[in-house]
Amino acid sequence: MKVAITASGEDLNSPVDRVFGRARYFVITDPEQTSVEVLENSQNVNAAQGAGIQAAQQIANKCIDVVLTGNVGPNAFRALEAVSIKVYQFGSDILTVRDALTAWKEGRLQEVKAPTAKGHGF
């Protein structure tokens, strides 16, 4: 299983990024293998529109099963849902990528069943 966590940096100790489409990085890990890969998303950080859809396409191309993020807009949510990628939301208590991954493994994050933002990550 591959999990992608929205991040401001490139490793498990990096701060999480609370916005899916405009996250600077996605830290990708297979919790069973303890491997880590980084997917840069800088092209979407300042995108005028379509950042969520483009980010979702990048995630889908990496065969991700689960996304952990603070917020996901409607277009990104629909794109992820269309390819059966589950989205889990973390709150303000989650500070690092490692915190998010641990909370998800322990069942402390809620699966998102609808967009959590109106768009543009807000």
Regions found by a protein language model. Name each.
Residues 1-50, 54, 61, 81-122:
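Non-catalytic interface/targeting segments
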